Amino acid sequence: MRCNHTLCVVAITFLVSWSQTLSTPVESRRTESPLVRSVSATEERNIFSQTAEAVAKWGTTTALLNLGKTDDEVKKILGLEKLSGEALKAHSNYHLLDDFITKLRDRKVTGWLHKDTTTDEVWKTLQLDDLFAKLDAKEFRHSDELKTYVQYVKKLDDDIWNYKRASFEPDSSSPLELAVKIHIWAKAKRPSWHVLEMMGNNALKGSKNRKFYREYLLLIKGKKPIIDF
């Protein structure tokens, strides 16, 4: 309840501030021509409308996030639970769902980073092996779960690359997980020595997963197309 109250106060304060800003030039406009006043008033109305919409969107999705709602619960709240595909995207409330999912994904990724969560733990948490078995390749590639995993791998890899953090890469990555990772590394143009370090024992000669390192080399040499997850 306190969270909702705070959001309302912030939104109202912001809107009041804008309304005061929009009402300030009234005196100066009296000396302007009717055409100039008309254009100016229209522009101001557009700015106010866009700002009010942005504040409402931020307040709605942030409140739902802070209440601990899941994406399925938010779909129901927004009247989207029975829609899918293009029908879902065409609904006037879809932008709220999309914004909520993005914020939820960002929050999850940030939390995992703070806990130094390994990538295979994230993979298992998102149940991606099970999801892959249920969906076709295209559906899996565009799933929210895989997008969340890819975002985490990218952020963790950037952290390791830019700040020389210790690698948290475990040796228990599933073959499917490694198949996704090599494309992420290739897209980021990581050198082979970095990939060897990240793969750990998986890249050693004699390992059954060594094939993914060889696959990575083909990707960075342009002999195979890189999938942009």
From Swiss-Prot:
Signal peptide as annotated in the record: 1-23
Major location category of this protein: secreted
Compartment(s) where it occurs, according to its Swiss-Prot or TrEMBL record: Secreted; Host nucleus
Swiss-Prot/TrEMBL keywords: Host nucleus, Secreted, Signal, Virulence
Record bears the keyword Secreted: yes
Transmembrane segments: none
Statement: the UniProt record of this protein carries the keyword Lipoprotein: no
Gene Ontology CC terms: extracellular region; host cell nucleus
Placement of sequence motif RxLR-dEER: 34-45
Induction (free text): Expression is specifically induced early in the infection process, in contact with host tissue.
Membership in a protein family: Belongs to the RxLR effector family.
Main function: Secreted effector that acts as a RNA silencing suppressor, probably by inhibiting the biogenesis of small RNAs in the host plant, to manipulate host immune responses and promote Phytophthora infection.
Domain notes: The RxLR-dEER motif acts to carry the protein into the host cell cytoplasm through binding to cell surface phosphatidylinositol-3-phosphate.
Record's protein name: Secreted RxLR effector protein PITG_22926
Organism the protein comes from: Phytophthora infestans (strain T30-4)
